[in-house]
Regions:
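Alpha-helical phosphate/pyrophosphate-handling elements in metalloenzyme active cores
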Residues: 35-66, 90-99
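A generic structural signal for short coil/turn motifs at secondary-structure boundaries
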Residues: 37-38, 77-81
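Structural motif
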Residues: 20, 58-62, 120-124
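Short runs of predominantly hydrophobic/aromatic residues within well-ordered alpha helices
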Residues: 22, 26, 46, 63-68, ...
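Histidine/acidic-rich helix-loop-helix segments that form or flank divalent-metal centers
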Residues: 101-126
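Post-HEXXH active-site segment of zinc metalloproteases
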Residues: 82-92
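Conserved N-terminal diphosphate/IPP-binding helix and adjacent helical/loop segment
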Residues: 1-46
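His-Asp-centered metal-binding catalytic motifs of divalent-metal-dependent phosphohydrolases/nucleases
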Residues: 49, 64-78, 87, 110-116
Length: 126
């Protein structure tokens, strides 16, 4: 799994999302993670996390939710702000616009919020 457009489309088009809309969200995420002020939550971090996710596929309840949570988990990064909540809200908005199933959106939001210090790290384990 990587951050390429083809992989993103494979995940997001599975529920019938419009390709152009999927491409626009992907471009937004790539731009966010490529910003010059990114030192840790950048594209290399996302690619690394996606690679790790591929190694634990058999231990994950919903791999699509995990992939999406990885892509969105810290896409919004503002110093001194609740980045997990902001990123979860953004993911919810964008995935809803892409017509993702509500249950999937809720899992993605829960996974993103689990990255907050003190969050539930077992939210997607089998």
């Amino acid at each position: 799994m990587d951050t390429s457009l083809s992989v993103w489309l494979e995940v997001t088009e599975q529920w019938g999302a419009n390709t152009a809309d999927c491409v626009a969200v992907h471009k937004h995420l790539l731009t966010a993670y490529s910003a010059k002020n990114r030192y840790y939550h950048d594209l290399k971090h996302i690619e690394h996390m996606l690679a790790v996710a591929n190694q634990v596929v058999d231990q994950v309840q919903d791999i699509s939710a995990l992939y999406l949570a990885i892509w969105f988990h810290d896409c919004i990064q503002k110093i001194g702000r609740d980045n997990e909540q902001l990123s979860a809200d953004f993911a919810e908005d964008k995935l809803t616009e892409l017509k993702a199933p509500v249950a999937l959106v809720n899992r993605v939001v829960a996974l993103i919020m689990s990255t907050k210090h003190g969050g539930d790290s077992n939210v997607n384990r089998k």
